[in-house]
């Protein structure tokens, strides 16, 4: 199941060398680009398209810290997006409501400064979450990591909403 890590010759871990990921991606994408197989057999062309698709999927997954964490959990048999991991701690739920309220008010008032401040706050929360994920994986505390992935998905979604409003 650690196929993506194997493809990129990376040790399965949350904390990876993203520069190495990028370089390996470029090399793999160039090597298996479907255009290089234009004069090959139909079978080889199909294989190149499938390989190119797998490379792109793997890169997108490993590049995004939350997707990488979810994928890493799956390699350990834990589905972070399963219903049993959807509950949030009461403190995080309260914080979610505050952030949503701030976002609604800033949108309604077309307050770009508040939106930028909220975006900075959420980015800082994401950085803290990534540090927490690193620690959870180091301790092999996969239940906590699964909850952190769900929190990270919320933060990603909220930042996307903020970006749309800016």
From Swiss-Prot:
For whether the record's keyword set contains Chaperone, the answer is yes
Source organism's superkingdom? Bacteria
Q: Which UniProt keywords apply?
A: Chaperone
* All residue ranges annotated as the J domain in the record: 3-75
UniProt keyword Protein biosynthesis, yes or no = no
Show the InterPro entries listed in the entry.
DnaJ_domain (IPR001623), HscB (IPR004640), HscB_C_sf (IPR036386), HscB_oligo_C (IPR009073), J_dom_sf (IPR036869)
Q: Which PROSITE patterns match?
A: DNAJ_2
What Pfam families does the record tag this protein with? Answer: DnaJ (PF00226), HSCB_C (PF07743)
| Gene Ontology terms: cellular component | iron-sulfur cluster transfer complex
Give the GO biological process terms: [2Fe-2S] cluster assembly; protein complex oligomerization; protein folding
Q: Which cystines does this chain contain?
A: none
Q: Which GO terms describe its molecular function?
A: ATPase activator activity; protein-folding chaperone binding
Q: What does this protein do?
A: Co-chaperone involved in the maturation of iron-sulfur cluster-containing proteins. Seems to help targeting proteins to be folded toward HscA.
* Subunit-level organization: Interacts with HscA and stimulates its ATPase activity.
Q: Describe the family membership recorded for this protein in Swiss-Prot or TrEMBL.
A: Belongs to the HscB family.
Q: Which NCBIfam families does this chain map to?
A: hscB
- Name-wise, this protein is Co-chaperone protein HscB homolog
Q: Which organism is it from?
A: Neisseria meningitidis serogroup B (strain ATCC BAA-335 / MC58)
Name the encoding gene, please.
Answer: hscB
